[in-house]
């Protein structure tokens, strides 16, 4: 007997229809999302299939652009991890040392602070690093032969997640948070507190950062303003004070340091941050540290280098790449950094580029400090104060660590052998001698001071001209370093002439151990000269952004920082304003307003018979490139522009295959998850190596990783 199908009821039909509609909606949304992020998905899940046809007779052609040195990703990543250890070993800066470092093997150390258990390995956005692919601080330090107090560390490791830390949501400050997340020492268990007695304290303080979000200049203000729905009151915020910013020590951090000083034999502070911080309290007084080591963001194996630095297997040779001020709020950049708004743009746009609803405002930044930023401000301010032109400025009170500063476990003696200005080049020769008892590297820093006329072209008093790092010098060994730089480098831009002007006169060339400490100096005489063409292309130079210059002269009058009167022209904090009051018009870009009726449409879709491979070895200016580009269709060009995140698709007309081009400042890492590639330490640490050759090796290593992983660029 045949089975009779039960008729569908209206209720079942409606229910099934609702489910089907929901599934269709989800499918449609998924299709839209997949299409929007197709290139990203292709990169991580595998792209569209492509085939390669070998031309007859090409069997013996050398088609490899570069020779792979490693067999696969695993081997390449292991080699890259070794370089990360080396980079951090040379890029970490020993900021202070009262004889506390290095530590002997077997020393019992107490790792303190939440960042001891939860270190900063990378940044936010494309700088995101997978912590599971990194050596943690505990294991890196233990591997160097130091005995870790597991009682204190175990408690911190079990409890740090109860204390939220800053989270940057890329390009969306409405969901970001600015917590430091440090655990007050009073919250430690009694057993953990007692366990640190008689040990050496390694207090790790950390700050994150990264793409799409600034650190807070006013923690209490940001909390009260509701700028982020996720940044809400808790025990930490109860201790915020008016004007406190994210780069100064918190009450909680000071409590840990104070406890370490009271209970431990030595207090060593490790700065796990890729930015200068206000560390004045650690230099003397209640919170004085015995040693301070800046290690930046660690990357995959930076923690092993930290252990080697602490024990002396690595001798610190890094140098700071910025001034470390005593008070950030007294810096000329502080008042005009961050998001100020034009408040009269309601209805101009509904959402910003990140699809966040507009609040009827538009951001602006007014660049009032001009050339006086970082060490160029502080060293110039010091020179003017010494000359009696900047009352109230005291360099020693304003600066904790100069630019180009760093200590070592040995001592070096530098001598300025010669300075010669011949033709278009200045040549400086210096000798470095290791006057200490252990092997180490030193950095040779050469600066110039140009003649300045009050009311003339704005010029810093001191500018870095060139640098070099020595090889590893054994105790008593010496090395002579030659540094060359073009005379043109000492010229300054003249907006009046629309060219670089090298004023005639005496230029002081100095050898320094940092931006402030002079070893020796000599003077060279230079004839006045104007450079009005680009030194590479020969293109005529001219002022750019004249409209913005006009804006600044009108709206920032008396606040454009000038060496002629630092005190009187010091920038005032920026405030929200109406664009109409500033004499500017904010309008959407309309391409039709810029259409050139006399322009000729470029050739597209031509059948010229060229393939992209035919361009191998061609000069950039070869006319064949134009012939190749004539083959592209408009759809192919727009497709490449609109679908090019982390890879680019195939282009049939020129036989371009689909290629993979990931990016990121920490190597081939990703905000979407693990990649199996190396995570490099932060650029902050790379720069602090002052070692060009080491950075070149790192660049070659990144290329080898790309070859091993099948990346094309």
PLM regions: where:
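C-terminal non-catalytic regions of proteins with extracellular/luminal or membrane-system context
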Residues: 1-712
